[in-house]
Design a protein with these regions (language model features):
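Bacterial N-terminal signal peptides that target proteins for export
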Residues: 1-9
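N-terminal hydrophobic or amphipathic helices and topogenic motifs
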Residues: 16, 20-57, 306-335
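Bacterial N-terminal signal peptides
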Residues: 8-18
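Pocket-lining segment of extracytoplasmic ligand-binding domains
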Residues: 84, 172-272
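Secondary-structure end/capping motifs
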Residues: 233-318
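Short, glycine-/small- and polar/acidic-enriched structural segments
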Residues: 26-160, 164-167, 184-190, 208-212, ...
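Short, solvent-exposed loop/beta-turn-alpha elements that line the ligand-binding surface or hinge
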Residues: 106-108, 121-122, 217, 292-302
Length: 335
């Protein structure tokens, strides 16, 4: 009888220990340098994860390939990335699952994605670009490449366009190369566009940029959040709390004046988009040019978006295995 009590007591203690560890585990998450990641970064800065009783470690990696490798090797528990990269990761490691998406809507005076060139160095119109052999800098196997493909197809370029691409795995590196006029034409996102357009050395004029396209008519895609299935299985409560904190951050960001966001969250923005940058070294003109978008609450990845991107990736030869929506998407944890 005494022995039975000990067995039961041991089982209860083990169960309690397991319950305590579930919320005490640290979620190791890497964010890409895109606006959709800001709610996660602000949730950490504002203590919203702490308020939910979870520990989140944000790991700064701007290189897509390095971020994917860290996730696939178990050095990260989750990453935020674009849909194309997320599906590519899921195809490479069957123990990954997309648990939600982050969506932002640009303000009326801003453009989230642009095809740009330097006047006098690159083509000055899209029509002129299509008649040249100039290289186009773009992030490799990403939604930016997907949207560039759709843009060129809509303008009658159906063959040979991939030979024109100069691929990058790091969005920050692409922005730096374009700013230095090493790449004549590039697909860039905000806030890199505003930064490049306004930054200039002392006693020099700002760069003269040509907007070849703002991707009007090309449907934009959300950012996706990918978790390791083992983490989801063992710490479902942390995943749910993570999304609650992100939803709270979205509401707070949307209700906070832009000036306050930039002032209070400057370190957050710089840490995400310009790793290692000194606040004092960022020109005020560049900060003033950054337009904070409106954010939407975390949402599921739609089956329509999933099917469109999978089809594109298969045609490009990026996906060889068949991916099923139900196998790589789990929407149970969204608020």
């Amino acid at each position: 009888m005494v022995r039975m009590r000990r067995v039961v007591l041991c089982a209860v203690l083990c169960a309690l220990a397991g319950a305590g560890t579930a919320m005490s585990a640290t979620l190791r998450l890497s964010l890409p340098p895109v606006f959709e990641a800001l709610p996660v970064a602000f949730a950490e800065a504002w203590g919203l994860f702490d308020a939910e009783g979870i520990s989140v470690e944000l790991v700064g990696i701007t290189d897509n390939q390095e971020r994917s490798t860290a996730l696939l090797t178990g050095n990260l528990d989750a990453v935020m990335g674009d849909v194309s990269r997320s599906l590519l990761d899921c195809s490479a490691g069957r123990d990954l699952v997309i648990t939600g998406t982050a969506i932002s809507t640009p303000q009326t005076d801003s453009v989230p994605l642009g095809l740009l060139s330097h006047i006098g160095f690159g083509a000055e119109t899209l029509a002129a670009l299509l008649t040249t052999n100039q290289k186009i800098g773009v992030s490799y196997r990403t939604d930016d490449e997907y949207m560039l493909d759709q843009l060129l197809i809509a303008n009658g370029v159906t063959q040979g366009w991939s030979m024109r691409y100069m691929y990058f795995n790091d969005a920050l590196q692409l922005a730096v190369w374009f700013a230095a006029e090493t790449v004549p034409v590039a697909v860039l996102r905000e806030p890199y566009i505003s930064y490049i357009a306004t930054y200039h050395p002392p006693n020099a004029a700002p760069p003269d940029l040509a907007w070849l396209s703002t991707f009007t008519g090309v449907r934009s895609l959300p950012s996706a959040v990918v978790f390791r299935k083992a983490f989801v299985r063992d710490h479902a409560d942390i995943v749910e709390a993570f999304y609650r904190a992100c939803a709270a951050a979205v509401e707070r960001i949307n209700a906070t004046p832009r000036e306050e966001l930039v002032e209070v969250g400057l370190d957050v923005v710089l840490g995400l988009f310009f790793q290692g940058a000194n606040v004092a070294g960022v020109p005020q003109d560049a900060l003033d040019a950054i337009s904070i978008p409106h954010f939407e609450a975390p949402a599921p990845l739609s089956e329509e978006t999933f099917a469109e991107v999978v089809s594109w990736m298969q045609k490009k030869g990026y996906l060889y295995d068949r991916l099923e929506y139900a196998a790589v998407v789990d929407n149970r944890f969204l608020p």
